[in-house]
Amino acid sequence: MTFSLVACDLEAGDWGVAVASKFPSVGAVVPWARGNVGAVATQSLANVLYGPEGIERLASGGSAEQVVADLTGPDDMREERQLGVVDGHGGSATFTGGDCVDWAGGRTGPCYAAQGNILTGPEVVDALVEVFLATQGTLAERMLAALLAADRAGGDRRGRQSAALVVRRDGGGYGGNNDILLDLRVDDHADPVPELGRIHGIHDLLFGKTPADEFLPIKGQLATEMTERLSRIGHASLQEWADIENLEERLDPSGKMIDPVVLRLLRETTATS
């Protein structure tokens, strides 16, 4: 009833899970991850203990294959379980119990594990893998592209209902105080994977990171333009407007530079004001 991709980007320090299902709120059950430790997807007749226990075993140095064996071995219902794991070194493993409903199976390679059950066919998992490997960009962008391709290839043969994207990076969370780089969910929607992509776009707009060398100095004509535009919409400062628009994570702490994304939004907001 679910297809998922567990993956990492070792260079960026990102670990994550992308998942879609004909099941409500799949993001509350399947995806688990921790920055610089690994990621787990537990599905089919999901044993939710696989998530936290798997992460702890990975944190203790277990490989993906070891963790899969340790979790499924003592589980009397393992033949109804499905599991994907990527460890802190990019090692991967997938498990599909013999009683998972067809089509069910998975594929692994360096830094990814793709799996699904009750699918239209193996082409769904193939699409996950092939598009993930062929796509350039951040881990989140690559996983979203793969999830959309798998959905278009047929997805869950019962239909569509929910989707989720989780990415963890040490210090990657809001304010740099945790590892929750992304935790996005579509709990009940007629077309959840494209909707997840839309929500990711909003998140990237508000919390994405523009390289510091692309920021623009607030001086001269640009400073005059910004002051006029902010005044036009009733704000005395960039900080005041940005706080209302939830753009504080994109502001330059010194107040002397502006993210070009923020400038574009200011111009769009004031275009007809």
Predicted regions and their residues:
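N-terminal nucleophile
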Residues: M1-G220
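A short amphipathic alpha-helical interaction element
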Residues: E214-P253, L265-T270
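Short, surface-exposed glycine/acidic/tryptophan-bearing loops
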Residues: G255-M257
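DNA-contacting surface of Y-family translesion DNA polymerases
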Residues: V261
